[in-house]
């Protein structure tokens, strides 16, 4: 399906949602997948000989170098691709209602962890002569009207980091892109989020934007995790070798408003 045979791909958020879909498709394309998730992986992954994983809390303040070390222990000193998919939501809190713990968790998981992982993976890619990094942001990275200030800031920051990495390493055959999904069915990003604690006033101001996208479900065209996963894996494939520094919405045109 994709030209990934024997390539080593690190995927965060690999146990569910977009990460699980990407892991499954990558394995079917012949890749060696190293998954990272706070949750244990499903048996559909652990039964695969080319899959290894590390249960890891990306919100912790510890270094992520042990992720790369564990991957190299499983598959050797090579990393061809990195998919930074893991993410957490906020409570749609505005700057005037924002709780410190919400801000710190969103920034830690959605921005700090991906940047630290890129820092650890880039030297490996430099030594081997190239690689591809794909970060997952959100419609919230393209707008200020779809989520809270913590999630919005973290995803805007990830877009900026992506562009910086793409330009800095463009002559070393290392590509870096960011995909911005819209609403996706059957994902776990809201797991553990108490929706009754959402900032009601903020949600009210965003209602029209969410309604414009919510009708996709009613029309039967709601995006599924595999729809996002296919874009991610295309960006790892050599057929996308001219694409770097791109910000790519996958959202049924939601980003047009």
From Swiss-Prot:
The Enzyme Commission number assigned here is: 1.1.1.-
- Record: residues binding NADP(+): 11, 57, 119, 151, 155, 184
The annotated pathway is: Secondary metabolite biosynthesis; terpenoid biosynthesis
Q: Which GO terms describe its molecular function?
A: oxidoreductase activity
Residues forming the catalytic site: 151 (proton acceptor), 155 (lowers pka of active site tyr)
InterPro entries given in the database record: NAD(P)-bd_dom_sf, SDR_fam, SDR_superfamily_enzyme
Which family would the database say this protein is a member of? Answer: Belongs to the short-chain dehydrogenases/reductases (SDR) family.
Tell me the Gene Ontology biological-process terms attached to this UniProt entry: terpenoid biosynthetic process
Q: Name one Pfam family in it.
A: adh_short
- What protein does this entry describe? Short chain dehydrogenase ausX
Something else the entry says is: In A.calidoustus, the austinoid gene cluster lies on a contiguous DNA region, while clusters from E.nidulans and P.brasilianum are split in their respective genomes. Genetic rearrangements provoked variability among the clusters and E.nidulans produces the least number of austionoid derivatives with the end products austinol and dehydroaustinol, while P.brasilianum can produce until acetoxydehydroaustin, and A.calidoustus produces the highest number of identified derivatives.
> What exactly does this protein do?
Short chain dehydrogenase; part of the gene cluster that mediates the biosynthesis of calidodehydroaustin, a fungal meroterpenoid. The first step of the pathway is the synthesis of 3,5-dimethylorsellinic acid by the polyketide synthase ausA. 3,5-dimethylorsellinic acid is then prenylated by the polyprenyl transferase ausN. Further epoxidation by the FAD-dependent monooxygenase ausM and cyclization by the probable terpene cyclase ausL lead to the formation of protoaustinoid A.
Native species of this protein?
Answer: Aspergillus calidoustus
Alphabetically ordered keywords of this record: NADP, Oxidoreductase
């Amino acid at each position: 399906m994709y030209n990934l045979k024997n390539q080593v791909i690190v995927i965060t958020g690999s146990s569910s949602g977009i990460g699980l879909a990407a892991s499954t498709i990558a394995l079917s394309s012949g890749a060696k997948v190293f998954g990272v998730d706070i949750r244990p992986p499903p048996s559909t992954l652990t039964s695969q000989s080319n899959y290894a994983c590390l249960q890891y809390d990306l919100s912790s303040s510890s270094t992520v170098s042990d992720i790369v070390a564990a991957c190299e222990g499983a598959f050797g000193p090579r990393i061809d691709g990195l998919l930074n998919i893991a993410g957490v939501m906020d409570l749609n809190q505005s700057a005037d209602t924002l709780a410190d713990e919400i801000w710190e968790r969103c920034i830690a998981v959605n921005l700090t962890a991906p940047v630290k992982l890129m820092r650890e993976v880039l030297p490996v890619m430099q030594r081997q002569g190239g690689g591809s990094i794909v970060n997952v942001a959100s419609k919230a990275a393209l707008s200020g009207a779809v989520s809270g200030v913590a999630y919005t800031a973290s995803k805007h920051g990830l877009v900026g980091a992506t562009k910086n990495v793409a330009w800095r390493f463009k002559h070393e055959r290392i590509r870096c892109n960011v995909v911005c999904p819209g609403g996706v069915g059957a994902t776990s990003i809201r797991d553990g989020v108490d929706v009754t604690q959402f900032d009601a006033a903020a949600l009210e101001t965003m209602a029209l934007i969410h309604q414009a996208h919510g009708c996709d479900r009613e029309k039967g065209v709601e995006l599924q995790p595999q729809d996002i996963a296919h874009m991610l894996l295309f960006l790892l494939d050599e057929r996308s070798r001219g694409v770097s520094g791109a910000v790519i919405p996958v959202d049924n045109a939601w980003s047009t408003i």
